[in-house]
């Protein structure tokens, strides 16, 4: 959401104009020309703003008429602890009187005109300088009112006031105003940036009186020991100057005290970050001002005696070089003092670091107990070694005694030596005899195995014999020769019955007499007959 002055600048810059002089709101001609440039459609939408805009318009009209209530004088900034409502009301000035006749109409035009604007590029700084008149008289009166606070403050913070004076130029006004939604939701007063040419003297006098009263009230409120926060982004110039100067004074006063150093470390970091953002002049804008209060958490950096990392490095160096009792005591006292003064509690790592590295009474007792345990273990090991050596020496003595007893009870040397030799020779002779028998039996087995054919050889021989017998019987039957007659002539008829001859014709008989003549003799005995070609 854009700021109010940025919206105003865009509204005026987007409309075509011939000259910038009649647009100055201090003159009635400029106001009339701006109001006359609005189209009828826009005029119908001027009063159609939301509830927040109408409420802020009514507040501005009541401010311009001099009517103030307690609800309108709400504090424009929140206290960090939530209890600064009563003290913060005394720091703000009363509403100003109208600087020109139709100020309420001009302010209502500014508020209601937001609905007609569209987002666009930002306006150059030169247009802002034309729209905003010079604010030199106001700055002078404000510097005077700040100087009335105390001469010491003016001498100490001269450079800060000069930097703030440079920042409060017409070109930088656009960066100090809150967005309209935020300002109206917080109940803040809309700052009027317009000043008049002739009536500026009376206004400056009123402002100086109000600022003097506010300065006294600020000193009273700060004397109680409570430091108000920095003013918000939508405060007026004199209130920001007063609050910044008083906060700087309180910052220096707290910087000297050593008791509250640890408690206010986070607030100091936030104040230093905001003061540095205020001193940046033209580079400071609304985004940087919004981000400045958010950096309070990152500003808590422990320095001085509570820097545990530095202490840890020192302790490591002393441990390497050799511990000294005085340095241990000094470092332990420093860490204990910093732990008492520090706002944040000690974490688990820091506690373990303190308990592990500082040689206190418990550390010495634990070290002594460990040393005693090690000494007892060493003594036990020595005792065990001595007992083992004594046991080995005793065993050797017993073995020597047994050997001497055995030597004393042995018989004569001649008889004792001849008996075992004879037994040994007899055993060797029997062993040679058994080995010879075994070799002879093994050779007989080898001969029998070599003489007997293999199984496949026996099967081949049997098949060949059966094939020859079957062929012989077939040839005889084809020639018409009686096989039995042939067998009888051969002298083998008594040993072969008819049944066996029939089985032999089919190739079933497995045995044959070795004395039988060859089967081809009958065929050779009959030379006149020849076998038929079909059978061959």
Swiss-Prot record:
Residues annotated as coiled-coil are 375-451
Region Disordered: list its residue ranges. 1-94, 185-234, 246-305, 491-536
Record keyword Phosphoprotein present = no
Q: Biased-composition ranges for Low complexity?
A: 48-64
Q: Where is the composition biased (Basic residues)?
A: 71-83
What UniProt keywords apply to this chain's record, in alphabetical order?
A: Coiled coil
GO terms for biological process, alphabetical: cilium organization
What Gene Ontology cellular-component terms does the record carry? Answer: cytoskeleton; photoreceptor connecting cilium
Superkingdom, natural source: Eukaryota
How is this protein named in the record? Testis-specific protein 10-interacting protein
Its source organism is: Rattus norvegicus (Rat)
Q: Gene name?
A: Tsga10ip
């Amino acid at each position: 959401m854009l700021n109010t002055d940025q919206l105003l600048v865009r509204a005026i810059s987007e409309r075509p104009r011939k000259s910038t002089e009649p647009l100055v709101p201090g003159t009635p001609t400029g106001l009339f020309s701006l109001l006359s440039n609005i189209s009828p459609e826009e005029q119908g939408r001027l009063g159609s703003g939301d509830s927040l805009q109408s409420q802020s318009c009514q507040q501005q009209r009541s401010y311009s008429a001099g009517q103030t209530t307690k609800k309108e004088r709400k504090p424009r900034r929140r206290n960090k602890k939530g209890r600064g409502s009563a003290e913060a009301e005394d720091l703000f000035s009363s509403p100003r009187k109208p600087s020109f006749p139709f100020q309420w109409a001009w302010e209502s035009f500014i508020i209601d005109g937001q609905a007609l604007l569209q987002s666009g590029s930002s306006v150059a700084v030169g247009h802002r300088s034309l729209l905003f008149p010079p604010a030199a008289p106001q700055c002078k009166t404000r510097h005077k009112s700040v100087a009335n606070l105390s001469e010491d403050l003016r001498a100490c913070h001269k450079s800060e006031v000069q930097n703030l004076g440079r920042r409060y130029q017409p070109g930088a006004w656009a960066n100090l105003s809150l967005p309209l939604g935020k300002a109206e939701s917080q109940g803040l007063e809309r700052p009027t940036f317009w000043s008049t040419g002739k009536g500026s003297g009376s206004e400056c006098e009123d402002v100086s009186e109000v600022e003097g009263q506010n300065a006294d009230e600020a000193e009273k409120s700060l004397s109680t020991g409570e430091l108000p926060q920095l003013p918000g982004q939508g405060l007026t110039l004199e209130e920001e100057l007063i609050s910044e100067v008083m906060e700087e004074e309180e910052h220096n006063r707290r910087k000297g005290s050593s008791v509250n150093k640890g408690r206010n470390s986070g607030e100091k970091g936030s104040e230093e970050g905001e003061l540095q953002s205020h001193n940046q002049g033209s580079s400071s804008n609304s985004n940087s001002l919004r981000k400045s209060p958010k950096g309070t958490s990152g500003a808590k950096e422990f320095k001085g005696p509570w820097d545990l990392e530095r202490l840890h490095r020192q302790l490591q160096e002393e441990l390497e070089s050799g511990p000294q009792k005085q340095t241990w005591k000094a470092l332990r006292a420093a860490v204990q003092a910093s732990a008492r003064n520090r706002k944040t509690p000690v974490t688990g790592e820091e506690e373990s670091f303190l308990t592990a590295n500082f040689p206190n009474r418990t550390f010495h007792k634990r070290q002594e107990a460990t040393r005693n345990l090690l000494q007892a273990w060493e003594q036990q090991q020595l005792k065990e070694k001595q007992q083992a050596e004594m046991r080995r020496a005793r065993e050797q003595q017993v073995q020597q005694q047994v050997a001497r007893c055995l030597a004393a009870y042995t018989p004569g040397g001649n008889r004792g030596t001849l008996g075992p030799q004879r037994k040994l020779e007899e055993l060797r002779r029997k062993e040679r005899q058994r080995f010879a028998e075994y070799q002879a039996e093994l050779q007989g087995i080898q001969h029998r195995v070599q003489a007997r054919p293999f199984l496949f050889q026996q099967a081949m021989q049997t098949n060949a014999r059966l094939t020859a017998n079957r062929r012989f019987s077939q040839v005889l039957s084809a020639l018409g020769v009686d096989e039995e007659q042939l067998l009888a002539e051969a002298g083998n008829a008594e040993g072969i019955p008819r049944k066996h001859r029939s089985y032999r014709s089919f190739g079933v008989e497995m045995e044959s007499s070795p004395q039988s003549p060859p089967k081809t003799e009958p065929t050779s005995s009959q030379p006149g007959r020849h076998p038929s070609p079909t059978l061959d």
